[in-house]
């Protein structure tokens, strides 16, 4: 019998024996008399007067956290981050979806809000929210990621938890009207190539989007995860552009203009661009490339003992479906396939799992994803071969490591 086969059988027997021992301990504990808790001896609370359910008080630690990286003179932060370490499925609850604003959160009355479509169209159109609600709608599950996700951790460990390193990421069910339906109704000119989306916030945040993308899969969204948008998510109306950096999915949408060229707004020149090795800057790098991260165990956590631990995490790609995730427990020297949890959906978070038998020695764990185009998540060193990593650098999709000490403490290991 080959040595590899013999080794595999020995390992399998060890795993089975460990699992059996654990099962015996569970059965032994279950055989002890079960005390009746106080909660089973008296009535519980009545239905509260408030009409909106909230999590248990024992889950108050699960919350969005604002970033302290960029805080203005009024001590305001315009980012808050999703607690990925506490997310157990691919859908992020509405109250935990990350926030990113350019001029605060406006309070818009849907009864007076209007959407205008104009420019290179045969018939300019104006819609109220009631008008849009009369159209048929579609619902899709998609991730949304800020282009600045992980920007503080390129070559040194600046953040502690996965919420801080990767928390500008969420996933939801988005419901709305395809923009293509409304543009077809308006009648787009044959030589049109670009579309402007403008928000009604204090910054009038505006982006130029190629017409072919708009006609493909862009939505005008008003519900998110089955309820109307939260104010911080663009209530009453936002654009949603699947797979692309979050800032192009303009919130509080008020205007769509069709033209034959992009506008080169501040958010397309001074911001949301990538420095290149030749000193130039790359514009319109819209797509969020294939990426993954281990969320359990991750920074700030501690493994209580050696033995079996399930490594968990998320993978995603703006170009399509995640087709594979590999996990390394030795700093990237060797990789083993993880299990992808169904459903695996196009441009959506995919959850992966890997069963790790930790021997109690220091380790470095990381994940690496592959998408349906064959693109393999790069290392930071790979990215540095084609881009300049200096200053405020976005679009970080590099492999992200966590170190595990002999005592079980998990820390950011980017370097």
Predicted regions, residues:
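Enrichment for repetitive, rod-forming helical segments
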Residues: 12-13, 17, 31, 245
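Structured, non-membrane catalytic/scaffold regions adjacent to prosthetic-group chemistry
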Residues: 32-415
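N-terminal secretory signal peptides and thylakoid transit peptides that target proteins
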Residues: 1-16
């Amino acid at each position: 019998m080959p040595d590899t086969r013999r080794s595999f059988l020995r390992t399998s027997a060890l795993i089975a024996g460990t699992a059996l021992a654990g099962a015996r301990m569970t059965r032994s504990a279950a055989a002890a008399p079960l005390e009746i808790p106080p909660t089973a001896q008296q009535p519980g609370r009545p239905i509260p007067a408030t009409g909106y359910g909230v999590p248990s008080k024992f889950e108050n630690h699960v919350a969005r956290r604002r970033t302290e990286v960029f805080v203005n003179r009024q001590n305001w932060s315009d980012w808050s981050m999703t607690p990925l370490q506490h997310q157990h499925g691919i859908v992020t609850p509405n109250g935990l979806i990350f926030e990113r604003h350019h001029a605060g959160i406006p309070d818009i009355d849907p009864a007076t809000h209007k959407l205008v479509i104009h420019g290179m169209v045969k018939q300019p159109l104006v819609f109220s929210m009631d008008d849009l609600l009369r159209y048929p709608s579609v619902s899709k599950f998609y991730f949304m990621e800020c282009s600045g996700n992980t920007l503080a951790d390129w070559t040194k460990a600046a953040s502690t938890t996965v919420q801080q390193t990767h928390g500008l990421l969420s996933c939801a069910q988005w419901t709305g009207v395809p923009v293509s339906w409304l543009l077809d109704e308006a009648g787009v000119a044959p030589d049109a190539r670009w579309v402007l989306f403008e928000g009604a916030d204090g910054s009038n945040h505006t982006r130029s989007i190629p017409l072919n993308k708009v006609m493909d899969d862009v939505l005008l969204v008003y519900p998110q995860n089955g309820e109307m948008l939260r104010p911080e998510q663009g209530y009453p109306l936002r654009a949603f552009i699947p797979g692309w950096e979050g800032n192009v999915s303009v919130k509080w949408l008020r205007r769509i203009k069709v033209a034959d060229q992009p506008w080169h707004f501040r958010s397309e020149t001074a911001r949301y661009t990538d420095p290149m090795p030749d000193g130039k800057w790359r514009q319109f790098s819209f797509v969020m490339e294939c990426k993954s991260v281990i969320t359990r165990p991750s920074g700030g956590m501690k493994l209580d003992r050696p033995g079996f631990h399930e490594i968990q995490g998320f993978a995603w790609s703006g170009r399509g479906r995640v087709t594979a995730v590999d996990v390394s427990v030795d700093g990237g020297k060797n990789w083993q396939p993880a299990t992808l949890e169904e459903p695996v959906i196009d441009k959506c978070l995919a959850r992966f799992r890997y069963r790790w038998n930790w021997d109690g020695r220091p380790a470095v764990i990381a994940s690496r994803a592959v998408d349906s185009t064959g693109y393999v998540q790069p290392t930071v060193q790979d990215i540095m071969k084609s881009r300049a990593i200096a200053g405020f650098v976005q679009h970080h999709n590099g492999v992200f490591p966590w170190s595990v000490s002999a005592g079980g403490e998990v820390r950011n290991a980017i370097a």
